[in-house]
Every structure is written in structure tokens, then in C-alpha cells.
Amino acid sequence: MTSVRVAWFVLMLALVPNISAAQVHDVLCRAGNSSFEASFRTGVTVSIGPQKDSEFSTRACQGTLSWGKQKLVIASGIPLLDLDMFGVDLSPGAPVAAFTTAKSNDACCMTYQTYSLNERPRLLRTITGGGFFEAADTDLDGDVEIWTDDSGAVDGFEGLALGEIDSVPTYVLRLDHNRLLDASSEFRGFFDDVIKRVRARVNPDLLRDFKASDGRLQASPDSPALELIRLNKLRAVKIQALEVVWAYLYSGREKEAWQSLAEMWPAGDQERIREKILKARARGIHAQLDGVSKGKLIKHRKPIFSQPEVKPATAILMRVYPPEGQEGPLDRKEIHIELVVDSAGKVRSVKPAGDTKLLEQYVQVSASRWKFIPAFKNDRSVASRMHTAISPLQ
């Protein structure tokens, strides 16, 4: 059995400050703003909340795992702390908890740590260098992937800030008996969508001008204003070219990556940038890998159980985000929804239920960020359907 105590949000959901739809990752504790506690059937309890200074809460987060009279501090005194998984089976009989931490609001990257939830928890794996981490049973086939990006490798690449890059190279990882495997090539459809989206934004005239440049696009101290404007426009094309190359390279298609580089990069600079791309990747998450996932030729979906068949999923994080540009209060009417929550505790689908006939986009965007302790059947984490109602507050 898993018992849960959640502060700030249960089924009546607090309306949090507006966040852009492009920002799809939320964290449980930000500057000590919320608390969560849950216990697993093995007797291990997770607690996340504001760090205490004497009797007062601080604007920092702390997370612990405790069992019996013992306690293990996962992190303390940090601005960001998230519980990404709790009770999730990465392999049969091996339930884990996973935490995402950041030591600074301004730092590029986060750290992801998985802990066993056996009677005496222990650290299993640490992954560093991602701008986010999110575990999901993406195909509902029972295999859990960890989605992240290689922010640490490309931050400052060619003088670029992460905020300038729309599509930071993505990794899809899998932990198999504690071996960290690259499963990105199994999700080429995702990378193809990135490539299609980036190519659609490329201006052919600017691409031609960029290919006629030196590729470095470095301004001199006495560059006139018009030249600076021109270089800035070419810089956008340069980023787009890198995004296409990265998408092919990180999805296991090196040949296509270099073909795209030849099509989109100045000929005289291709050897330099190719070597630099490979060096940057080598010092990122790639350096932490134990191999490449072989994958399955044919993926078979696992059953999605209804609530009477399982111990139901329970909420870790269920915040509601108002529509962008929302000025007045939202309708206070209760919204009934049916969710499919995968075996990693992430929402795979949301649709109206009961008296609710249509879902506004903000409900779907909000649901995509929710996290749950998954449902359990025979002590295994499984995908399930659940009905719930949300009531956005003014």
C-alpha cells in the first residue's frame, strides 16, 4: 500500500502563475513553495518541502527518504527539487524513486538521481547535464524512458546561449539493470518532427547568405550597425542548421547529420564545425552512457487497467495553468476528466468525462505537466485510467 499526504493541492487545484505553453516542465518544490509526502509498501517514506531553519520554513527545498528510525537526505538548501518517479518499476521487482535537483536558479543544468525503494534505499544512478528530466512509458509498452536534453554539452557552443536554441539536442535514455542506455533511435518520429519544424522556419535567402559566410559570424569592434543586424539574422540560420544536424546525430543517423551539414553550412567551415559538434557531444551525457539500447522490432502495448482492477494512481503534482493572456478569473465550474496515467506516473491522454463535453487547451496543457504515483497491480506499476474533477480557483 502507498499512503500519500499532499500540501497545497489535492483534487481542488490551486491556480498557479501563468506559464508559457512552451515551458512544459514543472517541479514539485521551487524556492520552498510546496510540500509532499508519501510512503511505499516497503516502509520507505519520501518527504519533499521547504527546508526548516529552526522552526521556520526557508525559501529553499529539502528532500529525504526515511525508513524505520533512519533518514537519508537526498538534497537540502537548493532552489529546485522534483520527485519525478515514486514506486516505478524500471525492471521486475525493482521499484525506484527519482529526483531532479538544481543547485541554482541560474545554472544551466539539473541532476537526476534514482534510488531503490527496497527496505534500505540506496543510490542507483546519477545523471548530470540535462536541462530537464522526465521519465515516461512513452509507448505504453511497459518500458520506461527518461527524456532529457544535452544542455550541458551545448551551453556556450559557438558563443550561443541556451535561450537562443529552440531545439536543444534531446536524449531518450533507458535504465536497464542500472546500465544507462541511449534509446533515442527508437523515437525517430520525435526527431523527425523537430527537423520538419526547424526546416519550415529556414529563410532560403538567409541560408544562401549564411553559406557564403565564414560560418563563425564574429563581428569586429568597428562593425557598422547594418553589419551587426546582418550577422544577427545569419546567426538565427546558423542555429537552425545546428538544430537539424543535432536532431539527426542524436537519433543515431550520423550519415544524414553530415549530409545536412553539407547542405546548410559554409563549405570552408564544415570540417571545423563537425569536429566541434562531436567534441561537444562527447563531453555531455554521451560520456555517461553504458551503451545503446537494442530496442524491440515490434512494440506491444501493455494493458491499461481501470480503477477497480488496481490500486489507483495518486497525485504528486497537479497544478492548473491559466490560458496565456488570461485577464479575469476562470470559470469556477468543476471540470470532469478521464486520464490515462502510464506506469511511470505521467499523463498520456486526457479527455472530457461526465458532464464535461469539451476541454479547453489550458486543461490539456496543464495535464501534460502532472505527475502521479502510478497505479499498482500485483505490486507492479502499471498504466491505468482514472476519472477526476478539477476546480480552478479564482
Give, region by region, the residue ranges found by the protein language model.
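Surface-exposed loop/turn elements that mediate protein-protein interactions on large endomembrane-trafficking
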Residues: 62-77, 113-128, 172-182
